[in-house]
From Swiss-Prot:
Gene name of the encoded protein: MVD2
Listed EC numbers: 4.1.1.33
Native source organism of the sequence: Panax ginseng (Korean ginseng)
Binding site for (R)-5-diphosphomevalonate: 25-28, 80, 163-168, 219
Disulfide bonds: none
Pathway(s) per entry: Isoprenoid biosynthesis; isopentenyl diphosphate biosynthesis via mevalonate pathway; isopentenyl diphosphate from (R)-mevalonate: step 3/3
Protein name: Diphosphomevalonate decarboxylase 2
Length: 420
């Protein structure tokens, strides 16, 4: 290893999106390899609005592997981080940086220590798949740093070892994670069904009901469901295989009514499995249920689905509108039913693609107060408003997969390898 005595630092920075499953992954047949009991399908969300940025660095001056998440140092000793690190280090190749005059041999990677900094631009551990983006970015960035030859499909099998849903964040657009049949998990990988441009009419509105960490982690919840729920096996064997075929067809044909019905039904069944678990798991709350009711009433009044809803392991609603016009009508309804409290300003209550507010006809907080009730609310039923039940809304769309960022986007100091 050249320049052993010099304090050089080599860094790579990557950005990876999160994803939301429309056919859910819930339950593992192997806890160590993280092998699922069913296939799943997801939509990758635009990383301009929801993503993880990770900088990985290596230097002979580093004394130990260290990691910082959202500015706070965390332990890298966890099994999932270590599984990914071992897999990537075993596949590392020679690296040469001609500008810095640095050569790292394949055998040197085992000796060199790493510094890693990661930042989520959305709530961590609140049911917005932050672990998916985080572990996918961890693997993608390390693979680039260590000059791996593996493609994203092969990297997805490594990311899966860190977080199951992370394997789906290595692609943009619509992604399928195959459960596989091999005991060693070699065929349990993700691949892209269609890119983000395939169905670019879709608009996604996320209602962040709670940014707090959930009481029951996904890992614990899955274990409990597999041990105690009778519904989960029926779901995995009888229901999901048919829905996977139907969802693939709906995505290929851009058939929104079928897409919406499948997404809503699968979300509801996933949460039914959680309720069928002993002790029961409550990821959704009253606000989640109110949002479902709002969407269902609207869809029924029109006669065909305008919006799909799906909830991961948390109370936050991911609402998928068939086009921008419908998305504006959706946000209009959401702002009517879930107006902000007086502490909010519009700029922080609706984030992401704020241009949709122009379509809604809302320019300030007073405009929200004057919104009329949606037409599906009957005249004889008073319109209920739930002020403060939603923390904020994120407007986004299907997005691209992971990318490398220039050095200017690094989270670590290029001289010291410590957080900026």
């Amino acid at each position: 290893m050249a320049k052993e005595l010099q304090k050089w630092v080599v860094m790579v920075t990557a950005q990876t999106p999160t994803n939301i499953a429309v056919i859910k992954y819930w339950g593992k047949r192997d806890e160590t390899l993280i092998l699922p009991i069913n296939d799943s399908i997801s939509v990758t969300l635009d990383p301009d609005h929801l993503c993880t940025t990770t900088t990985v660095s290596v230097s002979p001056s580093f004394e130990q592997d260290r990691m910082w998440l959202n500015g706070k140092e965390i332990s890298l000793l966890g099994g999932r981080f270590q599984s990914c690190l071992r897999e990537i280090r075993s596949r590392a190749c020679d690296l040469e940086d001609e500008k810095k005059g640095i050569k790292i041999k394949k055998m040197d990677w085992e000796k060199l220590r790493l510094h890693i900094a990661s930042y989520n631009n959305f709530p961590t551990a609140a049911g917005l798949a932050s672990s998916a983006a985080g572990l996918a970015c961890f693997v993608f960035a390390l693979a680039k740093l260590m000059n791996l030859n593996e493609d994203n499909g092969q990297l997805s099998a490594i990311a899966r070892r860190g977080s199951g849903s992370a394997c789906r964040s290595l692609y943009g657009g619509f992604v399928k994670w195959i459960m596989g049949k091999e005991e060693n998990g070699s065929d349990s990988i993700a691949f892209q069904l269609a890119d983000e441009k395939h169905w670019d009419d879709l608009v996604i509105v996320i209602a962040v009901v709670s940014a707090r960490q959930k009481e029951t982690s996904s890992t614990t919840g899955m274990q409990d469901s597999c041990k105690t729920s009778m519904l989960i096996q029926h779901r995995a064997k009888e229901v999901v295989p048919k829905r996977i075929i139907q969802m693939e067809d709906a995505i290929e044909k851009r058939d929104f009514p079928s897409f919406a019905r499948l997404a809503c039904a699968d979300s509801n069944q996933f949460h039914a499995v959680c309720l069928d678990t002993s002790p029961p798991i409550f990821y959704m709350n009253d606000t989640s249920h109110k949002i479902i009711s709002c969407v269902e009433k609207w869809n029924r009044s029109v006669g065909t689905p305008q919006v799909a809803y799906t909830f991961d392991a948390g109370p936050n609603a991911v609402l998928i509108a068939r086009d921008r016009k419908i998305a504006a009508l959706l946000l209009r309804r959401l702002l009517f039913h879930f107006p902000p409290t007086f502490q909010h300003c519009l700029n922080s209550y609706v984030i992401g693609d704020k241009s949709i507010l122009q379509d809604v006809g809302v320019q300030d907080m007073k405009d929200i107060e004057s919104l009329p009730p949606p037409p599906e609310i009957k005249d004889n039923i008073p319109a209920q408003k739930s002020n403060g039940d939603v923390s904020y809304f994120i407007c986004t769309r299907p997005g691209r997969g992971p990318v490398l960022l220039p050095d200017s986007g690094a989270l670590l100091n290029p001289e010291t390898g410590l957080p900026k």
